[in-house]
Amino acid sequence: MANNLISTPQSFQALKASLNESTYSTKKNLTFEEAYTFVSDEIENDKVAKLRETQKTTNFDKVVKDKAYYKENFNFYYTLIKNTLLSNGVRVYRTTAEGKVTLMDFDESARDLAASFVGWDCLEDAMNDNSITDIYVISWNKIFVEKNGHNEVYHKIFRSESAYRNFIERILREANKQLDNGENKIVDFELYGNRGNVVNDIIATKGICLTMRKHAEDPIKLQDMLEHNLMTKEIADILGTVIEGETNIIYAGITGSGKTTAIRALLNYYITKLNKRALVLEDTQELFLSNPHTVDLTTFPTDDPRTSITLRDLNISALRMKPKYIVVGEVRGAEAEAAVEGMETGHSTIFTMHGGNVWNVINRLVTKYLMQMPSLGIEVVERIIGEAINFVCIQDDIPGIGRRLTSMHEIGYDFEHHCVTATPIIIYNFEKSDWDWKNTLSNDVLNTITRRGVPYSRAKAINETIKKNMENIK
């Protein structure tokens, strides 16, 4: 593995095994800031730490900075810092918000110092809490988190504004990015499997603004979605059948609606059983499909367009790799045209997109396509898109209710009236807190999924299920 480019000497392992708090006596008490400075100076002169930092610098582009790397690196410095505290008889004390002075034990001191030195600083608890999905730092002393779907004030803040600035600079450096007053006033980055966005304080008036979206350690499964009533088993099976039938699907919603989580669960449950080849194209790897025959491709952005690999490049390349499924993490720009081209060439294409309703999605897709191919004209582009897409699903995160698949439309093109059509299949009824079943699938869709391997009896059973539910509503 690439991470093995950074080695841990045997002498360090022996040091780790020898740590024993009972053999040391306290020689001095330091504030956390004093201890941070003291530890920094000690580590700067430590031979093992110097070797490690040299290896990190030498192999910067080869080291995979994933969660495993983070954990190993954190534990390395935690052990080194704890030894530094113990061997020098240093105890760390903190003053609480109420003015109370408390001594920290060696373990707590070492962990908090390691978090400030190489970790997530005061956000470490949030990063280790699986119930927290998003972190919002408005300023150094005002932090919110999204926990179990609800926003709440975080229980910690950064030590100072300067400590927060140093933290931002450090994590961006680890991600090979920088924040400045020039071209990099707003920076998107990925680090240790998590996505982040930083906005400079010349734009964010309350101070540097940081938004973190955590990658889930244990991805939500289809059964979890059903238990939380995101959709019913009947709806999931209809989606699963049209996925198996290699149709073209856009799974859309606003930011934070859980569209990526939902499409991952659906694909993992239904595609994995099919033994079909899938290509996953993403800017930042998020889907992590469990299907064994999956090729994961990510973009490679650079300042030079000649060496960059964009989502559009990946889409075009994917057409030559004989996929059964092309799954695009999110379509937001020029890749829209290439994704639709994949649909037109007969490759099942499934992607997520931002949009509040089905027409938002169609309009955005038409606009993105026209930006890439302006000479075609809007009528031609609408015809291409209407013919290429089979379904648009919309998911929402509804206050007081939770995440719901709120609509599923079959998409087509009306050649007589020259317009895209969107026929509702299911619509979430807020008054009943249940789904209304509106229309059966068209014969064109049934024929498509049958040609792609779904037995006709199963294809027909979908419409029987829909008809039954439509009658129950009446």
Language model features: what each stretch is:
Residues M1-D180:
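N-terminal accessory targeting/assembly segments
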Residues I135, V198, G346, I389:
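Residue-level signature of catalytic and energy-coupling elements of molecular machines
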Residues V137-I138, K142-G245:
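P-loop NTP-binding catalytic core
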Residues T247-I249, T261, A265-E387, Q395-D397:
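Switch/coupling sub-region of P-loop NTPases
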Residues Y251-G253:
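Hydrophobic anchor at the beta1->P-loop junction of P-loop NTPases
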Residues G256:
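Walker A (P-loop) phosphate-binding loop of P-loop NTPases
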Residues R383-E416:
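Phosphate-binding/switch region of NTP-binding enzymes
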Residues S407-K474:
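NTP-binding/hydrolysis catalytic cores, primarily Walker-type P-loop NTPases
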